[in-house]
């Protein structure tokens, strides 16, 4: 399993709501991609729970920082993460093991 996908699963396990975008989304859709990091979109209404999940994974992210910057890079114990605070894009559920991740189309 690619490390960005493992990071997405851990965020999901910690209660975060998000949509995977970028090369990790392409890989999850079965396209040939080798993501180096995880890119996600988080809706402003879900930002608090997302920040809590990131902090549980060793990331240094605060809610005021995310709301002020609207896109941030965070290093976590599971790898690098780029977060974009915005409305959710169109997505589809993609099953990875026992979990379903929301993945941009």
Question: What would you call each of these model-derived segments?
Answer:
Residues 1-105:
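Compositionally biased terminal segments of proteins
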